[in-house]
Amino acid sequence: MQQAARAAAALPPRAHCLLACGSPAPLATRLQTCWGVTAPPRARRLSTAEGRGLEAGASCDDPTRVRTNVFKAAIRPSPEQRRQIGLWTGLRSTMVAEMISHVSGLDWFVIDMEHGPNELGDVLLQLQASQRGRAEPVVRVPWNEPVAVKRVLDLGAQSIIFPWVNTAAEAQQAVEATRYPGLGGVRGVMSLARMNNYGAANPGYYQEAAEQICNIVQIETVKAVENIEEIAAVDGVDALFIGPSDLSASMGHIGKPQHPEVKACIAEAFKRIAATGKASGFLTANHDDCKWALTLGCNFVAVGSDMQMLTAATKAAAADFHAYCQML
């Protein structure tokens, strides 16, 4: 023991860092021991809501609280509402999700499981990349089916689009998939998952989860349009989202979402949704139609998709430079 102590005393001062690094002492203490410096105070990370410049209901970093869904509150109709601008995504890319959420300036974006190639693991990675950013990730599930919804919710998704909802009964089925038994639903209970911080001191999750889940049902057929008031009356439905492509097909104008009859139907649908007090959503790559929808009172719009924008920009660049090269 005495020989070991003498050997340690003979070490150069900085070499004691190797001994201190194995110590269970706090990092600040080890820095002082090794290098004679004082660690700076640890900065507090902002919650998602604070990062958006909005009032924070609960920090993302607090494992005892359910993450506040700022998007759910932001789409609620009101005279002061700031319309929410978003984008559809189907490239199955965590980098796209991160870019949109952190630097694009958009308010929301869709991770599409119905028509996109996203599987459950892809959704998880995109949620992890985006949920601390500004834009809310909204997952469109492949179908209005409780198992698919349960698995997405367990990953931590809080905003869900349900495709092909035609009746109040189907809207009720969608809502029940997001709520636990005894609280109006059939959602399966999982105690250790991402949605409740892996069970970390969050006993209120099961009671509070539904308050922060945003349920968006898609209106994509003539039948759904006929049932707008009944669908909107279902408790737990937060928004009705008009899908112009499927709606035009349902009306006999497949591939022609700008047909006058289709646009007249959509305009009437916006008016009726507004009368119910629920939010309305819309998707189109045509920016004039996006502005038209906003003028009609639409509360949140997707102004295109990642694939569509990449394709259009690539084709435009190729045409521009091929034309330029012909002039050389």
Regions found by a protein language model. Name each.
Residues 1-30, 34:
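N-terminal chloroplast transit peptides
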Residues 8, 18, 40-328:
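Expand to "…catalyze enediolate/carbanion chemistry for C-C bond making/breaking, isomerization
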